[in-house]
Amino acid sequence: GGKHKRKEVPRVFRYKKSIPVSYERQGYIYFTSLLYWELPKRTQEKILNLCIAAGKENYQALFEFVTTDAGAQAVCLRHHLSPSTLERAVRRYYEAFPRKI
């Protein structure tokens, strides 16, 4: 048969034990970040700055990962990043995210 290109399944929120932030906070950060494009300009700037601080030279990959439903594998391939590098950036981002943005 012909090869079918696997359609990216939208990501779902999953609690990550590796991130020392509560389930509720992780959910808040996850969904707030996904709503990036609907947030006020000032909040968008805060999120972008958090990505720059946490992702450093890989901030564009981190930004794409937290503000879209692109999967980790796709983001890593696109930005030539190892999964562990992205994981560390995501952990820093979650740890630095303010209580209320």
Where do the model's predicted regions map?
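N-terminal interaction/assembly modules
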Residues: 1-53, 73-74, 79-80, 85, ...
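Short amphipathic alpha helix immediately N-terminal
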Residues: 53-70
